[in-house]
Amino acid sequence: MKKEKAIVVFSGGQDSTTCLLWALKEFEEVETVTFHYNQRHSQEVEVAKSIAEKLGVKNHLLDMSLLNQLAPNALTRNDIEIEVKDGELPSTFVPGRNLVFLSFASILAYQIGARHIITGVCETDFSGYPDCRDEFVKSCNVTVNLAMEKPFVIHTPLMWLNKAETWKLADELGALDFVKNNTLTCYNGIIADGCGECPACHLRSKGYEEYMVMKGERA
């Protein structure tokens, strides 16, 4: 364990919760930051707060409602249908979201004396979001370091993991059931197994079933 401080970009979903559990194993002191941008499932904020409390971690909540105004899409508006069309970005793409989140997480890290910033983005289950790519995160890391003259390190523990491997990591951290039962991934705001219909639920459940097969608990 590194005797350093870290901050986790935290939504209360499967990926960011797994990253938080990973960070708690890796760093002596960990805090979280959650962004409220009037997202489609607003209970995300409450779920993040609840999980942070259960794990004994401080949660910072930042009001990013301007993002909703700037980037209306299916993730921020209930009247926009969730859909994925061939050759186009998904309707849930929020332009610049991770750029904004990592920038503000870095500012907060500067203020609280944290060198390490953790985010749950990944390329393997790439949903078509350009700001989930490894090259974007590395570029952002260089930018925030130059902007604040600090040696921040942005960690992406899930970058090269698919959903089955993300479940495996949660299991290795001793928290498979915790992640399965407490996190909110569903675009329709249903905790744990979700609605079973939206793209996020399909990806989550498919990964879980694949991991159960890998583990030998499914035929």
UniProtKB/Swiss-Prot annotation:
Name the cofactor(s) required for activity, per the record: Zn(2+)
Q: What is its EC number?
A: 6.3.4.20
Among the record's GO biological process terms, what is one? queuosine biosynthetic process
Q: Give the molecular function GO annotations.
A: ATP binding; ligase activity, forming carbon-nitrogen bonds; zinc ion binding
* Assembly mode: Homodimer.
* Zinc is among the record's keywords: yes
Name the pathway.
Answer: Purine metabolism; 7-cyano-7-deazaguanine biosynthesis
Q: Which family does it belong to?
A: Belongs to the QueC family.
Record-given protein name: 7-cyano-7-deazaguanine synthase
CDD domains on file? QueC-like
Q: Which InterPro entries match?
A: QueC (IPR018317), Rossmann-like_a/b/a_fold (IPR014729)
Q: Which UniProt keywords apply?
A: ATP-binding, Ligase, Metal-binding, Nucleotide-binding, Queuosine biosynthesis, Zinc
Q: What does this protein do?
A: Catalyzes the ATP-dependent conversion of 7-carboxy-7-deazaguanine (CDG) to 7-cyano-7-deazaguanine (preQ(0)). Uses ammonia as nitrogen donor.
Which species does this protein come from?
A: Bacillus subtilis (strain 168)
Q: What does the cofactor section's free text say about binding? A: Binds 1 zinc ion per subunit.
The record lists Zn(2+) as bound by C186, C195, C198, C201
Q: Which reaction does it catalyse?
A: 7-carboxy-7-deazaguanine + NH4(+) + ATP = 7-cyano-7-deazaguanine + ADP + phosphate + H2O + H(+)
Sequence positions that bind ATP: F10, S11, G12, G13, Q14, D15, S16, T17, T18, C19, L20
Organism domain of life: Bacteria
